[in-house]
UniProtKB/Swiss-Prot annotation:
Catalyzes the dehydration of the S-form of NAD(P)HX at the expense of ATP, which is converted to ADP. Together with NAD(P)HX epimerase, which catalyzes the epimerization of the S- and R-forms, the enzyme allows the repair of both epimers of NAD(P)HX, a damaged form of NAD(P)H that is a result of enzymatic or heat-dependent hydration. This is ATP-dependent (S)-NAD(P)H-hydrate dehydratase. It comes from the Eukaryota. It comes from Caenorhabditis elegans. Its EC number is 4.2.1.93.
Amino acid sequence: MDHFIKLLPKLTPHLRKGDCGKMGVIGGSLEYTGAPYFAASSASRLGADLIHIFCDPDAAQVIKGYSPDLIVHPGMTANSIIPKLSRMDAIVIGPGLGRNPNIWPLMQELFEFVRNRDVPFVIDGDGLWFVSEHIEKFPRQMSATVLTPNIVEFSRLCKSALGEEDVLNVRNNSQLQHLAAELSRKMNVTIYLKGEVDLVVTPNGEVSKCSTESSLRRCGGQGDVTAGSLGLFLYWAKKNLGDDWTSAHHEAGIASSWLVRTAGRRAFEKHGRSMNTPLLLDEIPKLVRDVETREMKDTVHTDSSKH
């Protein structure tokens, strides 16, 4: 919770629209319309001011129907997306992206944009599949970037980058941590490995862990919530820490992990095996409010103790 409190921006009368975050989510295809919504909605409920979704035209009308809060842009070409990203404080690619081969050229131009702008960048879902398929073309100067694999996506990355063939059968957390550190060094990028214990590993070998109790349900969409919230936390961390990306990745990673795990646990306690990702999202506003209320009480107690 401490990481969460540290990054949560104060709301004051002096803030303007956009000050708490403008985020772009790139994803959404004919088959997968829920994933980009989950990523965007998590950031919205956490406190982002503006969220743009860039998606396949086949998905646009469906996603627009989910929420009037989201700004939806049909079109999955570099020419239609890259110029709009200059206004974004953080970018997430992958939720519901699909595997159309035409997406890879977009990703290559996006990599160049992120490197030049040094903007917080999260790669999740099918974005990781493309990275695994084109590992030799993944740039090595992506200091602002975090990859967020689950174990299946992690195994693909390890096979492509490290030549490791049997990662899916690794159950020992120490072994997984060793592999994540090796992958982070090899790719020169931060790895946020989701699992029984979430690991955030930076290329310098530093490791942060979050084992906060979570939901026993493994329903689809929880990783999308992680990607969206992480993107926003990375922006807030950058505002606090400047260009110290190592610290920003650890702070934001653990804050996101704690948020998703705690919201999932609360939803599971209420709904049991019927719990799903929309129910997890419903827990985020109350969770944020609880954290803010506790912080206010702690501040009042601390101030009172000084007199």
